[in-house]
């Protein structure tokens, strides 16, 4: 794909986003504020014994999230261990214990990290009834938590932040399921396969034999992208022609990753009664995304070495049908959201090019972030930003009429610290414990030296931020990585959720402070610039030393 075609691809995605984010954002606001339940929803409420008109305090909301997620982990783990007895197992045996644990945690936490080859490990029943179901509900949980935080800003003197079961079911049935159905049909029209055929041996033109996999790919591909999940039906993920056959399906999948996260700021603005606030948040997200895409594209177009110079760009690990700009667009969006899907191999990027997906995740995946998690992550950073602004002018910080006191700033600060601790401690332990270090260096790391460090840092960054992409040169199916990354995924998902829901409860209980001449206007360009600065300084600089030891040093040495 040439440069002009790549630019047109980016422009088309931006244009469609501009057109759809407003109606979709308004739709989600009405959906989560509605007091009307459909007949199907009422039947589900009766089945699980939930009163949809009864709201929950933040601890009750949290308990529901944790209980539901725990059941999800147990069900997905059990299905993998019993796979040999399930229909459509394709003759595949039970999944080993370590990988079963890692995979169950991965899909329940919306990470979709895959330390296995899907087409050679998972039968169709596990794929559809286990993993695909979690693609829906894990995304719905993320949106529900974001909506709970928005209610915290919107409500006054309230002890409740909504009903988790209502938010979960509405997000699944009214939003994700209909969109996925339409999306799957479009993907099938674009050439993505959808069947229940097993492996087929065919004769190639060269006279040999090749095994061709089948499967219900389009139905899973739709929610994989819409829910910013990212787990592929095939090991090559969206680089596989059965998942992403053409340049336009690649652009369409980029749009799917962005459409809900970029519409949620509009939902936020509608629910707090000031759409300008949502526009400001979306502007921050868009600015960071454009800067990241530009940097990655330039690094890959100007790759050093004789092969990139001969090809005109760094084409290693990239599909010709997608090209440099299409690969950079997909990789940027996949790591700025929590998707983690790939249509090119991030481990094959140039040193500085490979740093960009890593840095995108280190920013906290807030531009626009995953479905739900991106919005609540950016709102936490907004709390930090107004606190910094308050310190600069000597006023009590407030955001949307809510006072940002000691409790709120402690919760926001702890939120910021969670993922850096998981990433840096996990990486350090991988090299500090002698037995683990020997296994990591001898078994897991494909590339020694600076790039080997980058592979491990990338793995923990991806797991702790619930992204799921990888520097695939790292063998992550060892006992250390399946366990350590599983723990990182759990803590990286649920500790921030605890803090966000506690923040939502604290804000909802407050009265609203009247706006005065000294109130910081949080819908103007000055605040947009401040929030961008806080996002970059508070999060990215935390990782500067480890980036200097890995991709930066590798880039300078190349």
From Swiss-Prot:
Keywords assigned by UniProt, alphabetized: Cell membrane, Ion transport, Membrane, Potassium, Potassium transport, Transmembrane, Transmembrane helix, Transport
Highest taxon listed in the record's lineage: Bacteria
Main localization category: membrane
MF terms in GO: P-type potassium transmembrane transporter activity; potassium ion binding
Compartment annotation: Cell membrane
Any one GO CC term of the record: plasma membrane
InterPro entries: KdpA
Transmembrane segments: 1-21, 58-78, 85-105, 130-150, 179-199, 245-265, 279-299, 374-394, 416-436, 484-504, 527-547
Record bears the keyword Transport: yes
Residues of the signal peptide: none
Membrane topology: Multi-pass membrane protein
Similarity comment text for this entry: Belongs to the KdpA family.
Functional note: Part of the high-affinity ATP-driven potassium transport (or Kdp) system, which catalyzes the hydrolysis of ATP coupled with the electrogenic transport of potassium into the cytoplasm. This subunit binds the extracellular potassium ions and delivers the ions to the membrane domain of KdpB through an intramembrane tunnel.
Quaternary structure note: The system is composed of three essential subunits: KdpA, KdpB and KdpC.
HAMAP family: KdpA (MF_00275)
Protein name per UniProt: Potassium-transporting ATPase potassium-binding subunit
The organism of origin for this protein: Clavibacter sepedonicus (Clavibacter michiganensis subsp. sepedonicus)
